[in-house]
C-alpha cells in the first residue's frame, strides 16, 4: 500500500504548484499526535512528483502517442529546516517552485505552511528520467 502524503493539487502555474494534505491520526508518519520530520520531507517529495505529473499531463500530445510522465529521482536535499511539527488535524499547504531546469534536472525550492506559518522548507535537486519519453 502506498504512503500518501498529498491529498490534492490546489494551485499550478508554469513554475510553481501547491498541494494540500490533511494530517490524520492513524498515519504512518504520526507519533504522539505530531506529523514527523520524515513525513514533511516525503510531503515535499510527493508534491514535486504531483507537480511534474500534472504539468506533463497538460502538454499537448502528439497524435497517436500516449506518452508516460517522466520518473523523478531525488538527487540532493539542501537546507532542510523544520521549525514546528504539525498536529493531527492540521492542513498543510506545500508549495514547490522550479528555480532552475536543464537537461532533465530541476532545482526546486519548497515550503510547507500550516495556517499562516511556514513550518518547513528546503531546496531539492530532482532528476527526471527521459527513458520513457
Show the residue positions of the predicted features.
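Catalytic strand-loop segment that frames the active site of acyl-thioester-processing enzymes
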Residues: 1-40
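A structural microfeature
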Residues: 120-122
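Hydrophobic beta-strand-centered segment that forms part of the acyl-chain substrate-binding groove
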Residues: 52-93
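Hydrophobic beta-sheet segments that form the core/acyl-binding groove
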Residues: 9, 78-115
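Active-site helix/loop of acyl-thioester processing domains in fatty-acid/polyketide metabolism
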Residues: 9, 36-64
Amino acid at each position: 500500500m502506498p504512503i500518501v502524503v498529498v491529498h490534492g493539487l490546489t494551485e499550478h502555474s508554469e513554475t510553481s504548484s501547491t498541494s494540500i494534505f490533511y494530517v490524520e491520526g492513524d498515519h504512518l508518519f504520526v507519533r504522539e499526535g505530531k506529523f514527523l520530520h520524515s513525513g514533511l520531507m516525503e510531503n515535499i517529495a510527493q508534491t514535486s512528483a504531483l507537480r511534474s505529473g500534472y504539468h506533463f499531463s497538460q502538454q499537448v500530445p502528439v497524435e497517436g502517442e500516449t506518452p508516460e510522465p517522466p520518473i523523478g529521482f531525488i538527487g540532493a536535499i539542501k537546507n532542510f529546516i523544520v521549525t514546528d511539527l504539525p498536529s493531527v488535524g492540521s492542513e498543510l499547504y506545500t508549495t514547490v517552485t522550479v528555480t532552475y531546469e536543464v537537461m532533465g534536472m530541476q532545482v526546486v525550492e519548497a515550503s510547507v505552511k500550516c495556517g499562516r506559518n511556514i513550518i518547513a522548507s528546503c531546496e531539492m535537486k530532482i532528476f527526471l528520467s527521459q527513458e520513457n519519453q
